[in-house]
Every structure is written in structure tokens, then in C-alpha cells.
Swiss-Prot record:
Its EC number is 3.1.13.1. One of its GO terms (biological process) is regulatory ncRNA-mediated gene silencing. Keywords: Cytoplasm, Hydrolase, Nuclease, RNA-mediated gene silencing. 3'-to-5' exoribonuclease (RNase) specifically targeting single-stranded RNAs. Triggers miRNA accumulation in RNA-induced silencing complex (RISC), composed of miRNAs and AGO proteins, by degrading uridylated cleavage fragments. Required during plant growth and development. Gene3D superfamilies: Ribonuclease H-like superfamily/Ribonuclease H. This is Protein RISC-INTERACTING CLEARING 3'-5' EXORIBONUCLEASE 2.
Length: 206
């Protein structure tokens, strides 16, 4: 049975985020973990899945290729209130990643991200991956609060402006980022996902 058996991190409100990191191989079945993410988003998160994508950047081999054609998806982070799933993706993609494509195509959850427009374009152009129900939470915050600058803030700054929450835990990791180990980097990823869950909840209630 699939379980999030990675490190568990305590958030500032006393709750915990359970993590799972998967190096996706040709025989890796990620669908049970995606199902757990979807289930937690429905039960505990206003049907929202917080997503972040990470890229490997190369250079076009010929002049006919665009500047973005050398970008390839290297990993994906999916977060809910209680869970954080980090997928390291193979090159080239395997057939089992169709589960990820289907997950992103779901109409039953909202995929929430920060400054996501370029990522959405790259996913579609370079991988044929379409996120059907995606929301830029910074843009939503800017409209809700009447403050344009919120649309252009990163995760930390946006969470600070919307929630005014204690970011000391995240700041301490980022201050030593170059020396931080994999577990500390995973903790930072879990905190960022959890913060945006709370930003989404706050804006949804306004």
C-alpha cells in the first residue's frame, strides 16, 4: 500500500506535513501517491493542489529551435495541507508518466501555483502537458486585495504579505541553502507548499 513514509515536518501552527520523494523509473507506479494527494486536497484543502515544477535548461542544437526548446521538466512538487510529494522525473519520459498527465488534466481539483504562466506554456509546448484548471494565486491575491504587486511576488513574499505568518523556519534554511542537505531542502519545499495552501484558504474565505 502506498504511503508517505518520508520525513515529517512540523509547521508553525503545530500541524505536520508528511513527505514522499520518488525517483521515477520505468516501472514506478506513481498513481497511488497521486490518488492520496487528490484525496487530501478534497478532504482538507478546498480541492486545491499546490504545484511547482523545476526545469533542466539546455541550449538549442540548431537555429530552427526556439530558446525554450532546450527546457525539459526535471521534477514536480505537489502539496496539500498534510502531504508533499516530490517526483524526480526520468529522461526521456516513460509511459508511466501518463498518470501524471492525467492527474494534471483533472477537472475535479484546482492546481494552484505562484508565477505559473511561463511554466504552463513550457509544459504545453515542450511536453504536451496541459493543466486544465490552474490558478496563479498571486494574481488572485492582487485582485482580492487591490494590490497589483502581489501578482509578481515569490512564494515567501506572497505568504508574508497575505498571512503575516512566522517565516523564521524557512528563513533559517534559506540562509544556509548552499550547505543545506537534502532533508533540509525537502523541508523548505514542504513549508513553501504548506504556506501557499494557507494563502489559498485565506483568499477563498474573502
Amino acid at each position: 500500500m502506498a504511503s508517505f513514509d518520508g520525513p515529517k515536518f512540523k509547521m508553525t501552527d503545530g500541524s505536520y506535513v508528511q513527505t514522499k520523494t520518488i525517483d521515477v523509473g520505468s516501472s514506478t507506479d506513481i498513481s497511488p501517491y497521486l490518488s492520496l494527494i487528490r484525496e487530501d486536497s478534497i478532504l482538507n484543502g478546498n480541492r486545491a493542489v499546490i504545484f511547482d515544477v523545476y526545469w533542466d535548461v539546455g541550449f538549442p542544437e540548431t537555429e530552427t529551435k526556439t530558446k525554450t526548446s532546450g527546457w525539459s521538466l526535471s521534477s514536480v512538487k505537489l502539496s496539500t495541507r498534510n502531504l508533499c510529494l516530490f517526483l524526480r522525473l526520468p529522461k526521456p519520459f516513460h509511459d508511466n508518466l501518463k498518470d501524471l498527465y492525467r492527474f494534471f488534466a483533472s477537472k475535479f481539483v484546482t492546481f494552484v501555483g505562484v508565477q505559473i504562466e511561463e511554466d504552463l506554456d513550457l509544459l504545453r509546448e515542450n511536453h504536451g502537458l496541459v493543466i486544465r484548471n490552474a490558478i496563479n494565486v498571486g494574481k488572485l491575491a492582487a485582485e482580492a486585495r487591490g494590490t497589483l504587486v502581489l501578482e509578481f511576488l515569490g512564494t515567501r513574499e506572497l505568504a508574508h504579505r497575505v498571512l503575516w505568518s512566522d517565516l523564521g523556519q524557512l528563513d533559517s534554511i534559506e540562509a544556509k541553502w548552499e550547505k543545506a542537505g537534502p532533508e533540509e531542502q525537502l523541508e523548505a519545499a514542504a513549508i513553501e507548499g504548506w504556506l501557499i495552501v494557507n494563502v489559498w484558504d485565506q483568499l477563498s474565505d474573502e
